[in-house]
Amino acid sequence: MTITINNYNNDKKNLILGLTGSVATIKAKLLVEQLIQHFNLIVIPTETSLKFLSDQDFEFISSKCKIYKDKDEWENVDLLKRSALHIDLRNWANSILISPCSANTLGKISNGLCDNLLTSLIRAWDYKNKSMILAPAMNTMMWENPFTFKHIETLKSISPNVFIIDPIEKKLFCGDIGMGAMEQVPKIVDFTINNLK
């Protein structure tokens, strides 16, 4: 399968933005607005992340970059060409940014689970030659949970090309005040620019 994107520019590197089931996905439009200034961009939302995107934001994002969803993995299987979307996406990308990275997705990828397009891509990722950047976003108690620490340590041990953008402390969507909010979008974009392989 040929990977197609909107407004392709040979002078830019190729970045995949993964969106997961965290309320911080409401910042996806702002993230895309800033990332497309620096990268050829493809967005892969998990099914739960779509619940946090308004119709207007989804329409805006799809007008600026290509979106691949879980169903695209199965609709584009080509047995004759031996093509798989998650492999084609890996080959296309220079780097992947998962922002926000929910507790659920963090747990999945740190344990090698691959039950959707995004986690299948991560399971097939080339950690030796390509960077993977995660910006976790979750409730404070989820962030401070011992499992989260183990998941982060596991991912960091895989490769020096795995980067974690720690969350920040603020009043969270649920009303709690504490660590767990996704880092500010401009800082995520700057970090991605500076750590792209």
From Swiss-Prot:
User: Which family, according to the similarity comment?
Assistant: Belongs to the HFCD (homooligomeric flavin containing Cys decarboxylase) superfamily.
User: Which residues catalyse the reaction?
Assistant: C174 (proton donor)
Its annotated pathway? Answer: Cofactor biosynthesis; coenzyme A biosynthesis; CoA from (R)-pantothenate: step 3/5
Give a single Pfam family match.
Flavoprotein
A GO molecular function assigned to this protein is: FMN binding
What does the record give as cofactor? FMN
- Residues bound to FMN are F52, S102, A103, N104, T105
- Please provide the Gene Ontology terms (biological process) for this protein: coenzyme A biosynthetic process
What PANTHER family does this protein map onto? HOMO-OLIGOMERIC FLAVIN CONTAINING CYS DECARBOXYLASE FAMILY, PHOSPHOPANTOTHENOYLCYSTEINE DECARBOXYLASE
| Catalytic activity line of the entry | N-[(R)-4-phosphopantothenoyl]-L-cysteine + H(+) = (R)-4'-phosphopantetheine + CO2
A GO cellular component annotation here is: phosphopantothenoylcysteine decarboxylase complex
Identification of the protein by name: Putative phosphopantothenoylcysteine decarboxylase
Organism whose genome encodes this protein: Dictyostelium discoideum
SUPFAM superfamilies of this UniProt entry? Homo-oligomeric flavin-containing Cys decarboxylases, HFCD
Tell me its EC number(s), please: 4.1.1.36
> Is the keyword Lyase in the record?
yes
Which EC class heads this enzyme's classification? Answer: lyase
Q: What does this protein do?
A: Necessary for the biosynthesis of coenzyme A. Catalyzes the decarboxylation of 4-phosphopantothenoylcysteine to form 4'-phosphopantotheine.
Residues bound to substrate: N139
Its gene is ppcdc
What is the free-text note on the cofactor? Binds 1 FMN per subunit.
**Keyword annotations:** Coenzyme A biosynthesis, Decarboxylase, Flavoprotein, FMN, Lyase
Q: How does it assemble?
A: Homotrimer.
